[in-house]
């Protein structure tokens, strides 16, 4: 019967089931946990790849990444599937079937050990358009995440590069797939048209203003494919705005020039133009914004400006136009995207990247402006600007440029045709193969037939010659001089003041300003001086230009410029003296005199970085000027002759008193200090001793006091006493004496004795109420209480008991009364304890 025993119902389908069912259930649980872990890992990888795959560098998705990750669990439709649908849906195939062309290309499946340089070298090795940027996505550990982005300057460059490589690359023996990178459309949120706030998909009312979701859906359906899209309202990057950005603006262009250039096409006022300037140099950063009333007018103006032939020019520079990215958060595109707020710095970077892709062909009468197209000459060298410009840039800055050679009297100047490529910084560089401009050697040999101004004598190679055309000043190459607070231009040797926007020529001691129309530096003088400096060959155009200059008032006069230069010239006079003493011979030092403000500025400017200045070409000429200044006495070419050393007579007089005495105490031939009686090995050691030695300063002070008269000594002592600290407390103690010190405080005080009433201290008499009551009841004095007089005969005495001791406990009472003092209580307690020990 044991073999025929069947499994009971409780064993087969009871609470825990059979052993076979339990094993099968364990296997299913293990597989389920493994599948869940694989799904979780796959979901994390897909979420990170999806973000980097569909994001664009300027996309607002980057700012909303955290909210998107937080709401991943809620997505169940509109392209975002729920958790159960991840394994059944292929995002890659669905997305790349309808991918849109973009100027950013994504490389997927890269090796882990690859870096950005490897990708950049491989991409640049191909013929054709060169990329603008290559970015490899990395993890926190520094390893590659397996994909990278290659960004091109234009959409046509990216498409041509993709077609040339057939959307595949071979990197380190591995085939890499290439795809266009585009931002994923947002379906999970809806935008409120009233306040511009993005709300969660499940919210039926706006969180901020309470507007209904249905109203926003009717007015602007988010993510709808049927949304109207107008090509006139969109630029290449896919955004729309009522503002237009003007790129490649000259550094000295003003708002009036922009208004006059746009006047034939649109009516604007000054408030519609915003010209962006650098905070340090106060020059234009290369772009401006034009704000229009509506996007329709902006699109119409943009279409007109983009179809102009020749293109729009402002102050002789070809200007590029495009829609500007709005900084308002409520700007919504028809496809549901929101343009996030972009700072001016990001716009400047975009403008610089845009300008680096342009080719401006300039000539005397005008030129063409267009992008380099595939197949054109020089397209293969599209990205070699940074490599090719170096030798030509050095050749260009090694000598002063002169594009218009002076001709005979009455003949018009002949402009030299040049072509330049605008690189990432707003500088003009020559292309390979273009005719180079004439150098200073040609300009020095060819002189005008007749000029009213005197010719420059022995100008150094990098000296600025008035009337010669130069390239537009590039403030990005200026070097900041800490000693003077000015910016040094290594190309022209001029010093630039960002406050007054004037240049200072330290060789000729002149203030210059940049003229954008003439492309040259002109002296900041009156109109007569400027007109006299022009050649006779340009008399026809000088009168017209003179009228235009009169209409444009100067921001600062020559007097104001001199006052600005005077501030820092005073502070550096002392350093100038030390600098001049280190180079002048002893005979020249004995004949020191006050110098003009222009000379002070020149010495202060040339004092910076003496080691670097010695290597420059104009340093020997400057040294000759310093040494022979007192002998030749050239005419002062500064703007204001009224300013000289007289403005700081007090400081100059105090300094000269010590300087004359100190020079007599130094022997520069023997390199010895006669005051301290010390000899030094070289000139530098003697100079350091003179400037830094405390012993020399003390001896010099003693020597000066010995040469002073009694009145001078008294005046000096009085001045020193006034400058010293006055101890008024000591004077007060001397006058009124020192008060008695307070008595020291006692550490212990005797407790105050309180005399309280003690009526039973001497015993109880017969006058108390208790005694009278007992006598009324038949009690007699001396007998005990009770029926048989067996009770106590004396009253109960109040006693102090030990804490915690019962009434009958041993040692509960030491016989201490309430009237006993502290000493009596301690004495009785000690005696009781002693008795107990016995």
Swiss-Prot record:
Principal location: nucleus
Q: Where is this region: Disordered?
A: 1-86, 396-473, 524-561
List residue spans of RanBP2-type Zn fingers.
Answer: 186-215
Alphabetized, the UniProt keywords read:
Metal-binding, mRNA processing, mRNA splicing, Nucleus, Repeat, RNA-binding, Spliceosome, Zinc, Zinc-finger
Origin, by domain of life? Eukaryota
Domain G-patch, by residue range, is: 766-812
One Gene Ontology MF term? mRNA binding
Zinc fingers classed as C2H2-type: ranges: 671-696
Composition-biased stretches (Polar residues)? 396-406, 416-439, 531-540
Question: Which stretches make up the RRM domain?
Answer: 103-183, 242-326
Matches recorded under InterPro entries: G_patch_dom, Nucleotide-bd_a/b_plait_sf, OCRE, RBD_domain_sf, RBM5_RRM1, RBM5_RRM2, RRM_dom, Znf_C2H2_type
Record's subcellular location = Nucleus
One Pfam annotation reads RRM_1
Q: Which GO terms describe its cellular component?
A: nucleus; spliceosomal complex
Homology family: Belongs to the RBM5/RBM10 family.
Per the entry, what this protein does is:
Component of the spliceosome A complex. Regulates alternative splicing of a number of mRNAs. May modulate splice site pairing after recruitment of the U1 and U2 snRNPs to the 5' and 3' splice sites of the intron.
- State the oligomer form and interacting partners: Component of the spliceosome A complex (also known as the prespliceosome). Appears to dissociate from the spliceosome upon formation of the spliceosome B complex (also known as the precatalytic spliceosome), in which the heterotrimeric U4/U6.U5 snRNPs are bound.
Q: Which PANTHER family does the record associate with it?
A: RNA-BINDING PROTEIN, RNA-BINDING PROTEIN 5
What name is this protein filed under?
Answer: RNA-binding protein 5
The record lists the lineage as: Eukaryota, Metazoa, Chordata, Craniata, Vertebrata
């Amino acid at each position: 019967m044991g073999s025929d025993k069947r499994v009971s119902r409780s064993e087969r389908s009871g609470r825990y089931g059979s052993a076979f069912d339990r094993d099968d259930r364990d296997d299913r649980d293990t597989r389920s946990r493994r599948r869940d872990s694989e799904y979780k890992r796959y979901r994390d990888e897909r979420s990170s790849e999806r973000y980097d795959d569909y994001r664009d560098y300027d996309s607002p998705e980057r700012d909303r990444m955290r909210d998107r990750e937080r709401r991943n669990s809620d997505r169940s439709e509109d392209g975002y599937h729920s958790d159960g649908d991840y394994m059944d849906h292929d995002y890659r195939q669905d997305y790349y079937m309808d991918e849109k062309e973009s100027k950013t290309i994504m490389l997927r499946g890269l090796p882990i050990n690859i870096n950005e340089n490897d990708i950049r070298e491989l991409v640049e090795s191909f013929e054709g358009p060169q990329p603008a940027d290559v970015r490899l996505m990395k993890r926190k550990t520094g390893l590659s995440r397996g994909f990278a982005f290659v960004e091109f300057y234009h959409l046509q460059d990216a498409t041509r590069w993709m077609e040339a490589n057939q959307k595949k690359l071979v990197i380190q023996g591995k085939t890499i797939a290439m795809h266009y990178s585009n931002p994923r459309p947002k379906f999970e949120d809806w935008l409120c048209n009233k306040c511009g706030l993005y709300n969660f998909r499940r919210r039926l009312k706006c969180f901020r203003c309470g507007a209904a979701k249905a109203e926003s859906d009717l007015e602007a359906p988010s993510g709808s494919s049927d949304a109207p899209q107008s090509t006139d309202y969109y630029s290449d990057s896919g955004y729309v705005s009522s503002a237009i950005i003007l790129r490649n603006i000259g550094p000295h262009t003003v708002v009036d020039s922009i208004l006059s250039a746009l006047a034939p096409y649109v009516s604007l006022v000054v408030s519609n133009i915003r010209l962006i300037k650098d905070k340090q140099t106060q020059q234009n950063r290369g772009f401006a914004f034009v704000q229009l009333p509506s996007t329709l007018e902006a699109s119409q103006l943009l279409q007109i400006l983009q179809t102009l032939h020749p293109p729009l020019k402002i102050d002789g520079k070809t200007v590029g136009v495009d829609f500007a990215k709005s900084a308002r958060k409520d700007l919504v595109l028809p496809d549901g995207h929101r343009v996030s707020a972009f700072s001016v710095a990001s716009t400047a970077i975009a403008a610089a990247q845009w300008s680096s892709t342009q080719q401006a062909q300039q000539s005397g009468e005008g030129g063409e402006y267009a992008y380099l197209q595939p197949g054109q000459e020089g397209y293969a060298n599209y990205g070699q600007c940074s490599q090719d410009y170096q030798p030509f840039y050095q050749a260009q800055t090694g000598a002063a440029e002169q594009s218009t050679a002076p001709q005979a009297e009455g003949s018009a100047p002949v402009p030299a045709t040049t072509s330049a490529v605008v690189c990432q910084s707003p500088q003009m560089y020559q292309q390979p193969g273009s005719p180079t401009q004439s150098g200073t050697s040609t300009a020095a040999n060819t002189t005008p037939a007749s000029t009213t101004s005197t010719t420059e004598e022995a100008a150094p190679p990098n000296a600025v010659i008035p009337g010669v055309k130069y390239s537009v000043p590039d403030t990005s190459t200026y070097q900041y001089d800490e000693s003077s607070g000015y910016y040094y231009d290594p190309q022209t040797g001029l010093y630039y003041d960002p406050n007054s926007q004037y240049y200072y020529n330290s060789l000729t001691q002149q203030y210059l300003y940049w003229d954008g129309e003439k492309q040259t530096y002109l002296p900041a003088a009156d109109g007569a001086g400027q007109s006299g400096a022009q050649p006779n060959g340009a008399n026809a155009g000088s009168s017209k230009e003179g009228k235009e200059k009169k209409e444009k008032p100067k921001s600062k006069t020559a007097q104001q410029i001199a006052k600005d230069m005077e501030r820092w010239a005073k502070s550096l006079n002392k350093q100038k003296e030390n600098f001049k003493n280190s180079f002048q011979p002893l005979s020249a030092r004995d004949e020191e005199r006050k110098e003009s403000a222009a000379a002070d500025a020149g010495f202060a400017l040339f004092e910076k970085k003496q080691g670097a200045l010695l290597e420059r070409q104009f340093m020997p000429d400057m040294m000759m000027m310093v040494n022979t200044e007192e002998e030749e006495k050239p005419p002062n070419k500064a703007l204001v002759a009224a300013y000289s050393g007289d403005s700081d007579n007090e400081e100059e007089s105090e300094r000269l008193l010590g300087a004359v005495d100190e020079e007599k105490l130094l022997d520069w031939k023997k390199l010895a200090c006669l005051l301290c009686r010390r000899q030094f090995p070289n000139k530098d050691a003697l100079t350091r001793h003179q400037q830094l030695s405390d012993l020399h300063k003390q001896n010099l002070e003693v020597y000066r006091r010995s040469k002073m008269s009694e009145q001078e000594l008294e005046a000096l002592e009085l001045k020193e006493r006034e400058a010293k600290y006055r101890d008024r407390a000591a004077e007060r103690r001397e006058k009124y004496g020192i008060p008695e010190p307070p008595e020291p405080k006692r550490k212990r005080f005797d407790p105050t004795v309180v005399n309280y009433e003690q009526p039973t201290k001497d015993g109880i008499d017969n006058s108390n109420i208790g005694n009278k009551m007992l006598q009324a009841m038949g009690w007699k004095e001396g007998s005990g209480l009770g029926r048989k007089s067996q009770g106590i005969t004396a009253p109960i005495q109040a006693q102090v008991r030990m804490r915690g001791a019962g009434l009958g406990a041993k040692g509960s009472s030491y016989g201490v009364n309430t009237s006993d003092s502290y000493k009596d209580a301690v004495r009785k307690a000690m005696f009781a304890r002693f008795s107990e020990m016995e």
